[in-house]
């Protein structure tokens, strides 16, 4: 009997296990699926950045969705998947119902297979489950494998982020926009409202949230928050690009002591439980700005906190970028804790009266110097760290890279209005001298030399380097206003902030101190003191160039949106101020060959030029096409400037884009240009301009194709033609009239 009981017990175990499995299968809830819209977004952003997808959408044409659905957030993502065969419109129609419906196993398998045949097997799709919803949990596991195939650069990545605000709790917040500890992000298709004041682990790419991986809870620390106002019940703070009121967990009576300070806020379920104010402040001239530190006069290099803030507190409080900290500025205060800068506070606008110039080496070939030698007829104040020394007149300061002299920035300030002469430099004028002060810093690449100088003094050494002093005064005054405006705008770009400079002294910005100052050019600067060009109240980017071909062009030559600089227009240099347009290549070729086309700068040698070249010369600059068989301009920009050049060869063809690249491809140091006046000019490795036409003239005895290139003008062709301005001044036009001719809709005002 016992034996049979044991047998029944053993046989019963499998039955019990099978019964439990059946119960689990019957009663376990189905895993939630992922919508096709959400899946499409994740796939599209694995393949393209949001910017690339936006560009693709503009060229794509008509959407596959109905007109009343085109505005839905998911349309571009799904359109991209349909267009690239990740989804089949015959099986998955392009409509709202299917977009918001769940992705199926079959569809997930198709997407995986399109990326890699090996990925399809991970989906586990079969005939029985093919039309069932593919679980969201499984999709995100699969997504990790998809990223290894589609996003090998790791553009889609995981971040920890705190959500400060969404359209639900912030009035005026744009749809699908979240203010976060990572800045302003978009979250198309996600639901984030319930995550305000939560810390999340998320997947994102270039500012677009893709998926919330984990909610880390509501016990968070908001670091480096600016306190605007408050009362016993809560604080009004500036956090994540927004102003927001946050309540206290318990009433706090000393709120007035917190206002106008930076603090860390300890949060619990959306309420403040602790305020840690950071009161230590330092200030000093900004000498350089690095990725992880700021160099301050009197303090040296101070590291940045990992969650540092840059805040403009005058007017409306606004968060800025590290690049907005202007080197040379003395209007910044820095809030420090534990030896690190937690915030840079800008309490007033930066003055425009000084500029910091990186002095290039000989020949303007490098920003670094191996050796620098400086003398001065007067005494010099030498500053390094917290040490100050007065040097006698005629002292020689000699520094060699790597000698340890300038591992900390060396500042030299001439006394009694003297200038510092850099004996180790050679310019067109000889050995240059500099007003203001000079700074030397040794870097791993060599010595860096920076000149800080008054803006007007800087301009007096720019104008003679950019325009001959023999030119008409009104042309020189127009140049002075242009140069001042250009210098102001470029100085705000902080291009060399890591070295402590804003611009350099080469043609990349404006040539500075290459030619001796002149009384006439200095007078042009003085008579236009402080005057700049404005459009809608903002200083313009006052581009200028040497000589036109009879017409200018606009900023489209640099792939910029012309609408962003409406004052830069394509126009002819004639009294009518009309726009020249060319219906065909033949029309432009006819124009550029005309030496007698009337224009204000038609008398200058580079108004027209031409030269002979060959397939061999062009092939030396254009690789991968074999023996050259043909060259032609296939696209022109406003005014006829060449934008695309098709080069055909025995082994293929290539298209060169951009006027500068075309000038380089067709140029060569061996070329001899015949100019407007019949004289010749050699050494043009970069052609004078992109206003050109090219004609095939036959082949030589070796079968090499020969060409003649006809061109006109010198420079990029955007903004003011300097020789055009001279022609206008000779015709009796004043400097304001000249400037308003070249820059449409501008006003000329004195900078406050």
Where on the chain are the PLM-derived regions?
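Conserved, single-site charged/polar hotspot
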Residues: 2-31, 37, 48-50, 54, ...
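Aromatic- and histidine-enriched alpha-helix N-cap/loop-to-helix transition segments
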Residues: 31-38, 100-107, 131-138
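Conserved, structurally critical residues in compact or repeat modules of secreted/surface
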Residues: 39-43, 81, 103-104, 108-112, ...
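Active-site-adjacent "gating/activation" loops or surface patches in catalytic cores
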Residues: 71
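Extracellular interaction modules
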Residues: 75, 102, 131-141, 195, ...
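Short linear loop/turn motifs
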Residues: 92-104, 743-744
